[in-house]
Amino acid sequence: MASGSNVEEYELDVEALVVILRDRNIPRNPLHGEVIGLRLTEGWWGQIERFQMVRLILQDDDNEPLQRPRYEVIQRAVNPHTMFMISGPLAELQLAFQDLDLPEGPLRFGPLANGHYVQGDPYSSSYRPVTMAETAQMTRDELEDVLNTQSEIEIQMINLLELYEVETRALRRQLAERSSTGQGGISPGAPRSRPPVSSFSGLPSLPSIPGIHPRAPSPPRATSTPGNIPWSLGDDSPPSSSFPGPSQPRVSFHPGNPFVEEEGHRPRSQSRERRREILPAPVPSAPPMIQYIPVPPPPPIGTVIPIQHIRSVTGEPPRNPREIPIWLGRNAPAIDGVFPVTTPDLRCRIINAILGGNIGLSLTPGDCLTWDSAVATLFIRTHGTFPMHQLGNVIKGIVDQEGVATAYTLGMMLSGQNYQLVSGIIRGYLPGQAVVTALQQRLDQEIDNQTRAETFIQHLNAVYEILGLNARGQSIRASVTPQPRPSRGRGRGQNTSRPSQGPANSGRGRQRPASGQSNRGSSTQNQNQDNLNQGGYNLRPRTYQPQRYGGGRGRRWNDNTNNQESRPSDQGSQTPRPNQAGSGVRGNQSQTPRPAAGRGGRGNHNRNQRSSGAGDSRAVNTVTQSATSSTDESSSAVTAASGGDQRD
């Protein structure tokens, strides 16, 4: 028999087991999960009793009969007084229990496996130590355990033998004392003669009773003296001495009696002789009984629920009972992750422990077959029974409170895993057509509805992540304040406008924009800010939106006027210069090297340029302004020199 693991399973022949039971007049069939003790009367080890314990396995986990029944070996001591036993040779029992063999270590001794020898017990009386054949099949550790158990049993047997020897010696001593009464000398139990009549002279006499006459006189009995054998030694009923006159009272004779003259002349009392003959022989004291205490099976270890660990993950339940079902449904996966729940009983204990015994919310194992049934039961108890056609209103309330994902989970729990119904209701509460389309495209790639129901939450979270939405289906841009960034380039992507150094009306076509144009620009800017505060998808903004769609000012308009009005302090620090002759001519503009930000050039100006007002863009424009002013001074000096040469 293999001994590598604690539980060993082998094939079982049920028909052969039924035949063995019938041969022993046991009119019943074996049961699934029944524990049987086997008493092996003989085997390859010899004609010595050995014991084994097995458990029958006739059904699977679904209570369906097995095609090939099995039995497993239980590593526990057999207790024949409390267990169902089957006795027989090893060869006969192996017909039903295939590969049956002896257990490991001292378990083969059965009720003596714990080392307690019980006096008078038939199983203890049949104890025999291990044989050489058994020793050859044992390992070193197993042999040490067996020898330790054998030594304990044999020490108890030696103690009992010594006790029997002491009792035997006591009985022999009593017999020797009894036999010594037939020899010379007064033994402690030998009879003694009555005292002479003179010893009763001073005692009061009893009154005579009419109708009762004294006993007939008889010759006095000789007293026994040392060295002489009394003539009435063999007489069991010796005659008593007669006394004249009325009957004398019976006197108790003992060493402290003052009426007894001498110890050697004590009279023999007939009543004492008769009482001594009635006394039974001394019964030897019973040896101390060593009561056999059967080894109880180890109690089943109850599952310890780490309730504090679970509460540290889920938190405390809400105080409002109507919020408990949603809270439990949301935390059910977390509870399974911390402590896997396998049985309804365990699930019921966990839920009742978490809820803390709220009135009316204690569940039974029948209500906790699954997490869905538990949540549905709590929801009905806290919200009342609702018809199935009102499930949409229930899910809508959950969507408003917890979001689409939680509403889908609880909807599946309340509807009994009806995916078609719940998905149809949830579809109407998805945040936007883009989410509906992307989610449906992902769900269509699944095999069946069961797979879709299991992966619905995963696909929903993936779509939310792609579209820039949080777990509640809301835009993540609503909580982020846009921060403008300075741009170093001078192309179309430049978002910050630099201050102009020249006068506002220098050059052709550089008139101040109309009031309607500025109002339209400000309204467009306010509209863009409103769009940032509203919910929506975090899509790429349209940077090059045309002006007719509200994208900004035309390419001919400059922001110099707005910059001068918004920052009068910057313009006041600079000294205005007079207009140069011919500064509005395009030819002179192309000949004079000037920066694009200082003069509103046609080629380098951003058509969608917005008015600056942020703090960080102001810092950048301060540096640019100094560089632009120095460049404009040099260019104006060159223009003046060229004009003087022409006049000369």
From Swiss-Prot:
Marked site: Cleavage: R311, S312, F339, P340, N352, A353, N621, T622
Basic and acidic residues bias locations: 262-275
Annotated region (Disordered), positions in chain: 175-275, 476-648
Effect of W44A: 75% loss of particle export. Reduced virus titer
Region (GR-box 2): 535-556
Ranges of biased composition (kind: Polar residues): 495-504, 514-524, 559-592
Motif interval(s): Nuclear localization signal: 535-556
Biological process, per Gene Ontology: microtubule-dependent intracellular transport of viral material towards nucleus; symbiont entry into host cell; viral budding via host ESCRT complex; viral release from host cell
Region entry Involved in viral assembly and export, spans: 37-60
Effect the entry attributes to changing W45A: Complete loss of capsid egress from transfected cells
Region of interest: Nucleic acid-binding: 485-510
GO MF term set: DNA binding; RNA binding
Region (GR-box 3): 586-618
Protein name stated in the entry: Gag polyprotein
Annotated source species: Human spumaretrovirus (SFVcpz(hu))
Gene of this entry: gag
